[in-house]
Amino acid sequence: MTTIIGIKARDGVVLASDKQASMGNIVEDKRAQKIIPITDYILLAGSGTVADLQHIAKILKTELKLRELYSRRTMNVIEAANLLSHLLYQNRFYLNPLGLLIAGPINSKEFGIYSLDGIGAISEIKDYFAEGSGGVIALGTLEAEYNPDITVRDAIKLAEKALKSSIARDVFSGYGIEIYTITKKGVEKLFLEAQK
């Protein structure tokens, strides 16, 4: 399990996760990548089984690349979310439970975040969302401090605070914080150490 967070800001979006991967009650990895770049401008974050996340991310990367080659245009996050939904539904009997956030540009001025469950149901995130074993803990901080006019810069601070809260209380979250931003400037990655 884990904690992943998505925050929609007025000038972009923020995805954040902890770095711990667990196998039962054992810490399997302290540097797990739970946010995966799908394209140069679309990111996928996942809670659940890391192998399933990596598998579905590889398929999504390939399918999006093929669609971009055939159509000779860049796919937006809405198209990526719909494709991901289809892939999850096709594989619904083979994957362990997953919680996913996909983020990226809708057009040249807007950015979006979509939540998907393990069988492909999609929800557009209009403000913020937290998923995983520590998600409910992170939601308390997000609900108390989110502002609809938040900037990406402030959303980074809010994501960090919410993840630190989750890491302090959830035994399946920990060992660092990874934050990505998507703005008109592109995708940027931050890594922050956190106390366990």
Curated annotation (Swiss-Prot):
GO terms for MF: threonine-type endopeptidase activity
Catalytic activity: Cleavage of peptide bonds with very broad specificity
Gene Ontology BP terms: proteasomal protein catabolic process
Leading EC class: hydrolase
Record's GO cellular component terms: cytoplasm; proteasome core complex, beta-subunit complex
EC number of this enzyme: 3.4.25.1
Propeptide: 1
Subcellular localization: Cytoplasm
Keywords: Autocatalytic cleavage, Cytoplasm, Hydrolase, Protease, Proteasome, Threonine protease, Zymogen
Disulfide bond entries: none
Catalytic residues (UniProt): 2 (nucleophile)
Activity regulation as described: The formation of the proteasomal ATPase PAN-20S proteasome complex, via the docking of the C-termini of PAN into the intersubunit pockets in the alpha-rings, triggers opening of the gate for substrate entry. Interconversion between the open-gate and close-gate conformations leads to a dynamic regulation of the 20S proteasome proteolysis activity.
InterPro entries according to UniProt: Ntn_hydrolases_N, Pept_T1A_Psome_bsu_arc, Pept_T1A_subB, Proteasome_bsu_CS, Proteasome_sua/b, Proteasome_suB-type
UniProt function note: Component of the proteasome core, a large protease complex with broad specificity involved in protein degradation.
PANTHER family: ATP-DEPENDENT PROTEASE SUBUNIT HSLV, METALLOPROTEASE TLDD
Name of this chain's protein: Proteasome subunit beta
Source organism per UniProt: Nanoarchaeum equitans (strain Kin4-M)
